[in-house]
Amino acid sequence: MIRNLILIVFILSFSIKGKAQDAHLSLYDAAPLFLNPAMTGVFEGNWRLHAQYRTQWKAVNFKPYTNALISFDKPVKKWGFGAQITNFRAGIGNFNAFQGSVSAAYATPIDKAKRHNISFGIQAGLTQKTIEFGLLSYDNQYTTQNGGGFDQTISSGEEFAGSSIIVPVANAGFMYFYARQQSRFNPFIGFSAFNLVTPKETYLGADNRLPIRYYAHVGSRINITEVFYIIPKALVMQQLEFSEQAYAIDMGYFLKRADLYLLGGVVYRNSDAVIVSLGLKMDEFIAKVGYDVNVSSLSTVSTGRGGLELSFTYMGHKKKPRTEKICPRL
């Protein structure tokens, strides 16, 4: 009974908290398809390729958690189509969540000047989750010999229905943005919902459902001068009783001689971390690096070291850009 209880707690920690951990991209809006399906194809260009990688908790776990993501999307008139692959890996049991999804969005202006715009998006796919139970330790494997510890050569006596499950993915989102290029303020707001079908997710045969995860993100680009802008923004996530808020400010400064933007930003994730980011934006290429400084109760163990995150985006531009931008001015 104790062994089963320990394992149930372990699995549930990944099915709920682990899912929230999935969304712990500090540079959250650098990955548009991961944040909101309504952002699929909503950019000024012919196509977009994005990759992002994150590693965290190396200071407290010899097997750190890792997130890897790659996506591609393309606008086709008012439509946008895209695909995304993500992989999340965590813990001694090599828990792994691999997901493939496709998305589609429809964006349209709601005024004659094409300044106010809305978009709707959907996303669907499959997630495979695996775990290696043989790498876990159980209470009957504990021995007092040699100072005490777990001996995995001792049989655990446990049997499981399987170490791999596949669950469906169904997500949707909405977004509004003001796209006038000459404006001092370009606000945007979006809402998205993930796990809409609340799929059954368990290795133990129980009726454990993956709850819906909701996002709200809001902000505005503020053009201070012709060469300097800031973007104050916020993100709120809710999944059952679990919640997360992130408050951030991004900045960009244009270097005329180098013909590129210097990027910087600071994010505060409530009771968890402060994230500092730096980057460059040059022509079609955007690169960012972010680092988490842990400020939670775990900081005494982690000594403040949280996670390192890398983000790369390449946008292939059209030969004749539109005179009026139709993308969120991020």
Regions found by a protein language model. Give the residues of each.
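Positively charged n-region of N-terminal signal peptides that target proteins for export
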Residues: M1-L5, I110-D111
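Sec-dependent N-terminal signal peptides
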Residues: N4-F14
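Sec/Tat signal peptide C-region and signal peptidase I cleavage site
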Residues: I16-A20
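Subset of outer-membrane beta-barrel
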Residues: Q21-L330
